[in-house]
């Protein structure tokens, strides 16, 4: 590609509304342009990277035995009503009616569509297992799209769905997808981890996320220092304390706390250790519990894990917190004064709360707290469960080492769905015994456009993007100095351009009438890994200058050796 025939579209200024570095650099490098909130046009440089990612994904899916299909973005509402997700999915599901007043959705995912397809195409166990994938646009009506393509409303995704008659067969495909995903992200030179995860709205049993490590990531992922245990913080189990509860040393007393409406204010004003305080959170109770609200207790320095809480049978799904109006109607006090003593609601305490003694909590009276609370003296020990997020230093759930926490960007997710969709949609085949059998399913997704942003978060400096070779828009940039005035500079540039292209190298020849500084800055900004500078002075000694974008080193290479040298440097 020649820059004179290309839309480079680079920008010097950083857009004010771009929060994360990947969004900033994708705009500055001319990869994307915003059309509307959460909607982006991909420009030529962005498309080249997107296609590189897409091709790696497609190759590894094919290598793993998956079969490519293409399903419609627009889906009939009756399939979502049949699966039960019409009500469950929420406002992220964009719904509309056609001119015939028939309801449809823009697909955020395709479990319903693929299940409908396969129940009409597959009728015997002999045809299974099969694994189908597509790389296609999805739409989720995010309440607050942000971070550019990292959390956009429209995005490119690879989604795959496998069908089986046994759990053993599903496990084999699941393992194959785990391996394929590891190969995909390794080929892109991404620093990633596969972590245990919650299945979320997709449903099913076993699940792993593939997380690219980055400070800008939205997810907290935990690792053991003593084993290969890794999990999303939502999934990570907080082990119950093994030490017994200390005996009571304080009397129960009620204290005026008019200016302490949060744990932080309580700790600051009364110089309490935060680990000696308890937060009381009221959530809506399951309708079969006989109560409207249920109280959840966590230690003052811990955070409630909403995923764990939502799985409790006493808690309504999805988990929702009580409003201040509801709290006052039930308790007679505001949210900042809640506590377990004399509380006329079901109470569930975290394991760490159950071993506390002499602790402080709200008195269920505005502006008052109890200090010196002790279980089995001042109140009965409630139900106990794992309710909190793990913290650094916790014992690993496998008992080996302690936990560390890092930030990650989720770029892939694999699920063992089981019969969640096939059973309700009556997707059956004739089994080996001649009877109809519900198919078992797996589901495997990669956020293709999100991978592009995640790669930038890991690969950049103050001058721009530093692409790994495998997904760079161009692998080599040829920068001829004054080629429009020097015949031999132009001749070598054209010869090198033609030769590299014949070797299958993606190369960009900067044939603009621009100052060298502009040419260098643009190629650094868009992240070309290998740069060749051709100048008259160096040609006197039959040399050109090579610069590696990642390490920044320059070296002189003989013109007769440059092609062989570049082929040895490019990771293909």
From Swiss-Prot:
Would the keyword Transmembrane turn up in this protein's UniProt record?
no
Q: Which CDD domains does this chain map to?
A: ProRS-INS, ProRS_anticodon_short, ProRS_core_prok
Instruction: List, alphabetically, the Gene3D superfamilies matched.
Output: Anticodon-binding domain (3.40.50.800), Bira Bifunctional Protein, Domain 2 (3.30.930.10), YbaK/aminoacyl-tRNA synthetase-associated domain (3.90.960.10)
* ATP-binding keyword on record: yes
List locations, semicolon-separated. Answer: Cytoplasm
Q: Tell me the PROSITE patterns matching this sequence.
A: AA_TRNA_LIGASE_II
Q: Which Pfam families match?
A: HGTP_anticodon, tRNA-synt_2b, tRNA_edit
**Which reactions are catalysed by this chain?**
tRNA(Pro) + L-proline + ATP = L-prolyl-tRNA(Pro) + AMP + diphosphate
Q: Give the matching InterPro entries.
A: aa-tRNA-synt_IIb, aa-tRNA-synth_II, aa-tRNA-synth_II/BPL/LPL, Anticodon-bd, Anticodon-bd_dom_sf, Pro-tRNA-ligase_IIa, Pro-tRNA-synth_IIa_bac-type, Pro-tRNA-Synthase_IIa_type1
Q: Which PANTHER family match?
A: MITOCHONDRIAL RIBOSOME PROTEIN L39/PROLYL-TRNA LIGASE FAMILY MEMBER (PTHR42753), PROLINE--TRNA LIGASE (PTHR42753:SF2)
Task: State what this protein does.
Answer: Catalyzes the attachment of proline to tRNA(Pro) in a two-step reaction: proline is first activated by ATP to form Pro-AMP and then transferred to the acceptor end of tRNA(Pro). As ProRS can inadvertently accommodate and process non-cognate amino acids such as alanine and cysteine, to avoid such errors it has two additional distinct editing activities against alanine. One activity is designated as 'pretransfer' editing and involves the tRNA(Pro)-independent hydrolysis of activated Ala-AMP.
Annotated domain remarks: Consists of three domains: the N-terminal catalytic domain, the editing domain and the C-terminal anticodon-binding domain.
Similarity comment: family membership:
Belongs to the class-II aminoacyl-tRNA synthetase family. ProS type 1 subfamily.
Q: What is this protein called?
A: Proline--tRNA ligase
Organism of derivation: Yersinia pestis
